[in-house]
Amino acid sequence: VAAEAGWSLGAVQYYFSTRDELLLFAGRQLQADAEARIAGIIGAAEVGRALAERSSALDVALRLCEEALPIDERHRSEQLLWLALMMRSAREPGLQPSVGISWEAVRSTARMAVAALLRRSDWLEVGGQGLPLPDDVAEATAAELHIVLDGLFLQGLIYPERDPEALREDLLAALQRLRDR
């Protein structure tokens, strides 16, 4: 980590006395970066217009969900860190709150994606705040999408030889099925 950051080992150890502290800091930073990218997708000027069209709404949902998957080298590196944090939290209870935050972030992304699929721009903010969607069926659909995202997340990391485009295709097919119910 020190070499990658261009710091000496002593400098890193000054700021982070344990590996868990460093892992927790990195996880928080990645979470903030992902939230900023998602806010950029939602805040884009064309989202309001895009949701008016069925195919564009699907594209918005796809872009949101791709943030939770190892679809390129940057996302893969981030997802590997999250997986390490999740695995470590099984032995270190102090890390479990961060894993809970990660779970909430993926659920929030799923809620926003469902809001996009349903073309409900008024629900995007609700989903983004971590609140349940105002419709029970939509909230259940978000829970289902969350499960799909977790499965694709693990497949992408466990089977790195799998083409990221195949992950996208599986995600797109799942989103289309959810939309067309």
Label the predicted regions.
Residues 1-25, 29:
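Helix-turn-helix
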Residues 64-68, 82-86, 145, 149-152:
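Short alpha-helical scaffolding segments that buttress acidic/His motifs in well-ordered protein cores
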Residues 45, 89, 156-159:
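Secondary-structure edge/capping motif, primarily at the C-terminal ends of alpha-helices
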Residues 39-77, 127, 131-133, 142-145:
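Hydrophobic alpha-helical connector segments
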Residues 95-100, 104, 117-181:
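Hydrophobic/aromatic-rich alpha-helical bundle segments in the mid-to-C-terminal region
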Residues 19, 26, 30, 34, ...:
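Hydrophobic/aromatic residues within well-ordered alpha-helical segments
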Residues 60, 73-97:
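Amphipathic alpha-helical segments used for helix-helix packing
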